[in-house]
Amino acid sequence: MAPPEVVNQTVRNGPHDLIIREQDVNGPKHAYVTFLAGDGDYVKGVIGLAKGLRKVKAAFPLVVAVLPDVPAEHRRVLVEQGCRVREIEPVFPPCTGKDSPFVRAYFVVNYCKLRLWEFVEYNKMIYMDADIQVFDNIDHLFDLPRGFFYGVVDCLCEMYGHPCPQKLPWPAQLGPQPSFYFNGGMFMFEPNLNTYNELLSKLGITPPTPFAEQDFLNMFFRDISKPIPPIYNLLVAMLWRHPEWVDLDKVKVVHYCVSGSKPWRYTGKEENMDRADIKMLVNKWWDIYNAFTPWI
């Protein structure tokens, strides 16, 4: 991932102004994108992702959509890693009262991903959560036909419907169940202001459901969703839930989404975290984070 040609933009960040890299008007038409909120340790995941993309010689930049509460120092580090930092405003679903409808309360912040459809200087973007690492070049995904929303089928053992015994029903308020249910941690989409406005309008009249923006995006794009192979988003839980579907030698993208599997927090003490394959994948992440030198 070559250092981007950029123009400077001043971002107001409390008492300090931060000069960040911004999209060059003649820049690339595709990009990778991730999302960061708050002042916690997820910035390490974004740094790791940026280094991973550079190591596999990705041809396109990594855009980091940040909420206003991401501190200036974190933004500065990301710029130093070659990221294009873009501040976005929060997005909130309709109020649901005191009780959270989400499987995990923090899922509510993930609705901010809808802002990514505003990034219309790009024709296509591949979104990846900050707890993802890329171990092989995936630029070729940008060559897939336009007009579709691409994602990897999620493991539904703890979600809805097939292929495992049903544990939670697909929310009736979201209409017909999609033909496949993709994971919201990695997907390819086409930024578009009309789509963006439709997303926000639909969100305003759609009650929140357990898996937050993942449910919502599955509902919204149900008619144009296309599956891509699981090698592009290996959920680490698949290693013990569906080992028959996993060939680690072919996996290009790993999603450290299970509790205890985040490499920068890893202790090996949580359930399933003492597995040899998990330890190997955590070590691979750290090899990139610690050893890869920027812009070489």
Residue locations for each model-derived region?
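Glycosyltransferase catalytic domains, chiefly GT-A lineage
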Residues: 1-296
